């Protein structure tokens, strides 16, 4: 059997700097550890609610706390990391070091699904830290285009790690010995698709462009799109976006009228920015509304939320045209 390139071998061929490679290696190790914890959840008694809420006012699962602590510990011990911010924590944490990188992460995306054994994941973003001085919250408020690397791990039938550093997107599968093996050397999202992912139960609350787009998809061959579409919805961003990375599609978590003063649901720094970098580098588009690129958004606060429309480029354009 052919031996597949491992993560270290792939990183050695990447033109990115050694320090960012070190950070990626540490995060990959933490994700491998999280994979084991997630897989043994019911056996180890780590499923279920933790009996508290996070900064997002969401009920925390036990695994939210466990996975958050795994990543925090790994990153604090990583020399090039000057600071970190987690979806689960109200404030940033610093390491006492200057220069290097800042890391933002969602330790367990889709954790509401964990008790029913649906795929969940970890999402992360690596940003440049200021050259001197201990980082402050303001240093994390960088547009997504300033990310030096981003990635996610998805814990499903296989555990996969999808990364972008200097260019392109690559996917790795965790083998039985705990090594990340390169299984998807050039992830590319096709421009056209016949699948959409959206929570249809909120249809009555959407803005007109989103309604028109989905109505066109639902009309199938007899409608304006002239082809049939399938709907997919896991309610785990990492799982839905991973499917799109592997075979195309469009993922939509749009603004809706239930809370009109809130711009969206997904977190810009922990979810939308890293996923947008991956999607764009794989040939797709990632926007707020079909028009405005998420990577161009200037963050104004640590836990800022945004609407998301991303995936196959021509489908995202169709939303804008609606």
From Swiss-Prot:
Q: Where does the record place it?
A: Cytoplasm
Keyword Magnesium (UniProt): yes
Which protein, by its recorded name, is this? Fructose-1,6-bisphosphatase class 1
Q: What class of enzyme is it?
A: hydrolase
Q: Which metal ions or organic cofactors does this protein require, according to UniProt? A: Mg(2+)
Q: Which PROSITE patterns match?
A: FBPASE (PS00124)
Alphabetized, the UniProt keywords read: Carbohydrate metabolism, Cytoplasm, Hydrolase, Magnesium, Metal-binding
Q: What is its EC number?
A: 3.1.3.11
Q: Name one GO biological process term.
A: fructose 6-phosphate metabolic process
Domain of life per record: Bacteria
Recorded GO molecular functions are: fructose 1,6-bisphosphate 1-phosphatase activity; magnesium ion binding
Cofactor info, note text: Binds 2 magnesium ions per subunit.
Instruction: Detail which positions bind Mg(2+) 1.
Output: 87, 106, 108
Subunit and partners:
Homotetramer.
